Structure formats: structure tokens, C-alpha cells
Amino acid sequence: MRCLSIFVLLVLLVSFAVAELDVEGEIVKQLLTRGTLKDADFWKRLEMQGCVCNANAKFCCGEGR
């Protein structure tokens, strides 16, 4: 039973890490393909995932609002 709970915890941890990498990969892709960070839908998705941005187009994820 203990092994099962450890396995479930590891699966959740890995899925969270993959989701975080996906957000960062999306940011890099936006920077490379468009050269700008003014895509409103893109920033809205980031805000929904707990990311914030400032006027200098820098970003910090995981710090809340």
C-alpha cells in the first residue's frame, strides 16, 4: 500500500513538472516565432495558470498575481 501511494505521488509530481515545462516552452516558442509578447490569448492562458508579466515583457511563473 505504501508503494502505491509513493507511485501516485511520483506520477502527480511528474505530470506537474511536464505542465510547467509546457508553459515555459510555449513562452519560448512565442518569443521565437513572433518576436513579441503582445498576443492577448497567450497572456490570458498564462494568467489562468498563475503566471504574471510586467511592462518590460519579462515573466515569472509560479509567483501568483
Swiss-Prot record:
Disulphide bonds in the chain: 51-60, 53-61
Span of the signal peptide: 1-19
Tissue and organ expression note: Expressed by the venom duct.
Q: Which UniProt keywords apply?
A: Amidation, Disulfide bond, Ion channel impairing toxin, Neurotoxin, Pyrrolidone carboxylic acid, Secreted, Signal, Toxin
Q: Which residues carry this modification: Glutamic acid 1-amide?
A: 63
Q: Where in the cell is it found?
A: Secreted
The question of whether Signal is a record keyword is answered with yes
Question: How is this protein annotated for GO cellular component?
Answer: extracellular region
Q: Which GO terms describe its molecular function?
A: ion channel regulator activity; toxin activity
- Give the superkingdom in one word: Eukaryota
Record propeptide residues:
20-48
Give the domain note: The cysteine framework is XVI (C-C-CC).
General function of this protein: Probable neurotoxin with unknown target. Possibly targets ion channels.
What name has this protein been given in UniProt? Conotoxin Cal16.1
Species annotation: Californiconus californicus (California cone)
